[in-house]
Amino acid sequence: MSIIGVGIDVAEVERFGAALERTPALAGRLFLESELLLPGGERRGVASLAARFAAKEALAKALGAPAGLLWTDAEVWVEAGGRPRLRVTGTVAARAAELGVASWHVSLSHDAGIASAVVIAEG
């Protein structure tokens, strides 16, 4: 396998949270319901959502940042052991198939008010 693309992105947690407050419908345009909630059904914190948004931005960059990708066609989920993963459908899956992406690697972090993510597309 070889690396097809790499993307990295950062998001300021406070600014991202303010955007979600200012525009309540934004969360539904960016995230699936499964991404907004913790396994117990509680709402996920802003830092965690900012990291997930950074992952979606990084994923778009790894795919060459084409127009027309839908944010909700990329889902950031976490394995039982805590490892973040990506699940792609629709517009994102189509672009990934076009490029020959067979697997994804994603790393999320948030500290000192900044959320970050790195995505590697491998094929």
Swiss-Prot record:
The keyword RNA-binding does not apply. It catalyses: apo-[ACP] + CoA = holo-[ACP] + adenosine 3',5'-bisphosphate + H(+). GO terms for cellular component: cytoplasm. Transmembrane segments: none annotated. GO terms for biological process: fatty acid biosynthetic process. It is an enzyme of class 2 (transferase). Disulfide bonds: none annotated. It comes from the Bacteria. GO terms for molecular function: holo-[acyl-carrier-protein] synthase activity; magnesium ion binding. Keywords: Cytoplasm, Fatty acid biosynthesis, Fatty acid metabolism, Lipid biosynthesis, Lipid metabolism, Magnesium, Metal-binding, Transferase. InterPro entries: 4-PPantetheinyl_Trfase_dom, 4-PPantetheinyl_Trfase_dom_sf, ACPS, Ppantetheine-prot_Trfase_dom. The keyword ATP-binding does not apply. Mg(2+) binds at D9, E57. Pfam families: ACPS (PF01648). Its main location: cytoplasm. Its EC number is 2.7.8.7. Its cofactor is Mg(2+). HAMAP family: AcpS. Belongs to the P-Pant transferase superfamily. AcpS family. Transfers the 4'-phosphopantetheine moiety from coenzyme A to a Ser of acyl-carrier-protein. This is Holo-[acyl-carrier-protein] synthase. The gene is acpS.
